[in-house]
Amino acid sequence: MRLLQCSMFMFVALLASAASGLGSEIGARTAYALAQAGKLLIIDVRRPSEWEKTGLPTPSVGISLQNSLRKVRRGFPDDVLDAVDGNKDRPIALICASGGRSAWAVGLLQEIGFSRIHDISEGMFGNGKAPGWLAHNLPVAACESC
């Protein structure tokens, strides 16, 4: 019983630290749990062609970092700001295929004042350290606008 209590305490502490903005990286399972609880907005920064192949994490919002030429879209920061209703302190987590673009986008958004932003660094497919959203069998939804 004591082990169960200790495990629950550690889980709650992990969720609290992830939601409070203390760390910049967050695991896919933790991000999913926080998003399900309404404490975190997940933003998928991959391209629509990628969303079409795998679907988007559920729950999440798709806001592509890049245009079709793989250049950073000028409207990306404004689209993220719209997604959080102008609240740069709202907890958000970014995800891409394997952590590269999401890490870059975290830095970009921090530079313009976002304060509670996390990187789901394992991405959809894994990054060599963790298996990724899909390997965890976390839910995805078809892209309706692709």
Placement of each model-derived feature along the sequence:
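Bacterial N-terminal signal peptides
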Residues: Q5-S17
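Rhodanese-like catalytic fold shared by cysteine-dependent sulfurtransferases
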Residues: S17-A37, E52-P91, G100-C146
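Short glycine-rich anion-binding loops that position phosphate/pyrophosphate groups of nucleotides
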Residues: P48
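Short, surface-exposed ligand- or partner-binding patches at beta-edge/loop junctions that are enriched
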Residues: L94-C96
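Short hydrophobic beta-strand that contains or immediately precedes a catalytic carboxylate
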Residues: L41-V45
